[in-house]
Amino acid sequence: MAGIGPITQDWEPVVIRKKPANAAAKRDEKTVNAARRSGADIETVRKFNAGTNKAASSGTSLNTKMLDDDTENLTHERVPTELKKAIMQARTDKKLTQSQLAQIINEKPQVIQEYESGKAIPNQQILSKLERALGAKLRGKK
């Protein structure tokens, strides 16, 4: 009876498709220490600006000289005095409060306050809404 006893194989087991260690696994402390003990060469490289967007945000250094040379006063155009007076006059003629006018044109009351105080930056859409709601021409020649 030749078949009795432990079964033995005469070939080596082969593992198919075992993934090689990825870069993160090669960087861990255990692997690095094992490489040091075995005397293998270890190269440590830190990536420059990795995970940041410093290259895109460092644009201030490019135009610094131009900004320093520029002495022009850069401000937004505000509502002219005639326009804010015209808005106030038309609103009071219609006997509307600022909040009522804001509700009619679907804007916040703060927008009307800014226009009437002259702090707002003129917006053509809002001005056209005001013209329609107040029935008065606010832009252009009168």
From Swiss-Prot:
Species of the source: Arabidopsis thaliana
One function term, GO molecular function aspect: mRNA binding
Entry note about domains: The C-terminal domain (75-142) is essential for nucleolar localization.
GO biological process, one term: positive regulation of DNA-templated transcription
Protein name: Multiprotein-bridging factor 1a
Compositional bias ranges of the Polar residues kind: 51-64
Sorted UniProt keywords: Activator, DNA-binding, Nucleus, Transcription, Transcription regulation
InterPro entries (alphabetical): Cro/C1-type_HTH, Lambda_DNA-bd_dom_sf, MBF1_N
Tissue: Expressed in leaves, roots, stems, flowers, siliques and shoots. Detected only in anthers and some seeds in siliques.
SUPFAM superfamilies: lambda repressor-like DNA-binding domains
Gene name of the record: MBF1A
Stated family: Belongs to the MBF1 family.
Compartments reported by the entry: Nucleus, Nucleolus
Recorded superkingdom: Eukaryota
Domain HTH cro/C1-type residues, every copy: 87-141
Listed Pfam families: HTH_3, MBF1
Ranges annotated as DNA-binding: 98-117
Function statement: Transcriptional coactivator that stimulates transcriptional activity by bridging regulatory proteins and TBP, thereby recruiting TBP to promoters occupied by DNA-binding regulators.
Annotated spans, Disordered: 51-77
Induction details: Not induced by heat or cold treatments, H(2)O(2), dehydration, abscisic acid, 2,4-D, ACC, methyl jasmonate or salicylic acid. Weak induction by salt stress and pathogen induction.
